[in-house]
Design a protein with these regions (language model features):
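The conserved Walker
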Residues: 8
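Small-molecule kinase domains that catalyze NTP-dependent phosphoryl transfer to phosphate-bearing small molecules
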Residues: 119-168
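Conserved substrate/cofactor phosphate-moiety recognition/catalytic segment
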Residues: 14-66
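Hydrophobic anchor at the beta1->P-loop junction of P-loop NTPases
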Residues: 4
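Glycine-rich phosphate-binding loop used to anchor ATP phosphates in small-molecule kinases
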Residues: 53-97
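Conserved glycine(s) of the Walker
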Residues: 11
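C-terminal accessory "lid"/substrate-recognition subdomains
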Residues: 172-186
Length: 186
């Protein structure tokens, strides 16, 4: 399984779409699942309800990845995983290698992207998008820090200075069961 994580607005969704297209592997983005569920459940969402649906969605996306793993299939999961909850879920997964691509970006650029997305009029109404108004940078980076487990190899990428070809090749090697044995920065 490949998990693309990072703080909201860091460029995860853009990256997963590109990797899925270029590598021909399955992929699922947390926001797409959350929006699908919100459309089918209907109604408007308070901050608390949106957060609750987000927790369920993150869990569902990880469980989907685990099920694909059990079937011997590869999938790329994209989510702004809240680290402590995700690590607990992954403890129950088959102990197969996981490649984590942790996407980072300067805070000024993350906020610019985040607020542009919020103000674009194209953002689904289920997203309350007040994260950067409520928490400090330290709290956000701690909440969405990289996952740590014996079977997780982490590659850290800066979406403002991304060597996409190198990252794509790393993901391709992982998919072909080639060992990626140390933490890397690309």
């Amino acid at each position: 399984m490949i998990i693309i994580t990072g703080i909201p607005g860091s460029g995860k969704t853009t990256l997963v779409k590109r990797l899925v297209q270029d590598l021909g592997v399955r992929g699922v983005a947390q926001d797409a699942v959350k929006e699908f569920l919100a459309d089918h459940l209907g109604g408007t969402y308070t901050d608390q309800q949106s957060s609750a649906l987000g927790r369920v969605t993150r869990r569902a996306v990880l469980e989907l990845g685990i099920e694909f793993e059990k079937l011997g299939e590869q999938i790329i999961i994209e989510s702004a995983l809240q680290t402590s909850a995700a690590e607990e879920i992954l403890q129950h997964s088959p102990h197969r290698p996981i490649l984590q691509i942790y996407v980072t970006c300067g805070l000024a650029e993350v906020k610019r992207r985040f607020y542009a997305r919020k103000q674009s009029g194209h953002r689904h109404s289920v997203h309350t998008d007040d994260l950067y108004d409520k928490l400090t940078e330290h709290e956000i980076r701690d909440k969405y820090r990289p996952l740590v487990a014996d079977n997780i190899t982490t590659v850290i990428v800066d979406s403002e200075n991304l060597d996409y070809a190198a990252l794509r090749d790393t993901v391709k090697d992982f998919l072909m069961n080639k060992a990626i044995t140390e933490e890397n920065e690309i």
